[in-house]
């Protein structure tokens, strides 16, 4: 509280959540001065220890705060928030676990768990700018699910039958089913993108990241 009062007294722009705080100034010189003053105040007046490994002077692009990173929007002439690269990597890792082909659960259960992950992640990062990221992650999730579905179909005969049900020509379905290539390669082919497309996966119950983000986004 006293740290907050000090920032207000000195007319410093700051954001604070629990014991995490960002103080914003216009120059590196000002930043170093504020860093010294705040650190001295915390240690000498409050009797607390400042963790210097987590405290630093940096530009907005170099910050990670509560899972967010920052970038400069040249059109809006201001800095904006987005999910930090480490947060994105953590999401991708969890998504990969939920779409593991060797995980012995049904694909509908995988979709259920994916939806929980997607909704929770976007609900948290909804103030960030991430339309392009959501589209990229959407495509990745669909690709991973195609591999799960292709493996579930197992036999060439079953794959031909299911591809034809999804509107694929019989000859193309036969060639695809008997291609002998690895699952990862088959599921990158155009025929698979057509057969198991975004609309069909949504019908199967999958939440589209870009659609959900567009509904939730407060800055769009």
PLM features: what roles do these ranges have?
Residues 1-8:
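Short, small-residue-biased leader/transition segments that mark boundaries at the very start
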Residues 12-45, 122, 126-127:
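Catalytic palm subdomain of template-directed nucleic-acid polymerases
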Residues 110-156, 160-164:
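Non-catalytic, peripheral interaction segments enriched in hydrophobic/basic residues
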Residues 45-119:
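A conserved non-catalytic segment of reverse transcriptases
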Residues 8-9, 65:
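Structural motif
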Residues 144, 149, 153-220:
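Extended C-terminal regions of large enzymes
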């Amino acid at each position: 509280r006293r740290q907050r009062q000090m920032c207000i007294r000195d007319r410093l722009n700051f954001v604070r959540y629990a014991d995490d705080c960002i103080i914003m100034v216009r120059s590196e010189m000002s930043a170093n001065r504020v860093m010294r003053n705040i650190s001295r105040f915390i240690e000498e007046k409050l009797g607390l220890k400042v963790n210097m490994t987590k405290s630093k002077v940096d530009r907005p692009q170099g910050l990670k705060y509560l899972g967010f990173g920052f970038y400069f929007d040249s059109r809006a002439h201001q800095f904006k928030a987005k999910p930090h690269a480490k947060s994105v990597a953590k999401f991708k890792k969890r998504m990969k676990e939920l779409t593991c082909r060797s995980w012995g659960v049904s694909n509908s259960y995988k979709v259920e768990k994916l939806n929980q992950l997607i909704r929770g992640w976007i609900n948290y990062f909804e103030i960030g700018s991430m339309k392009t990221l959501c589209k990229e992650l959407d495509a990745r999730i669909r690709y991973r699910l195609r591999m799960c579905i292709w493996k579930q179909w197992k036999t060439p005969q079953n794959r031909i039958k299911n591809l034809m049900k999804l509107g694929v020509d019989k000859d193309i379905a036969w060639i695809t089913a008997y291609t002998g290539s690895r699952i990862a390669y088959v599921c990158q082919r155009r025929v698979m993108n057509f057969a198991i497309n975004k609309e069909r996966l949504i019908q199967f119950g999958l939440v589209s990241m870009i659609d959900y983000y567009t509904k939730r986004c407060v800055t769009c």
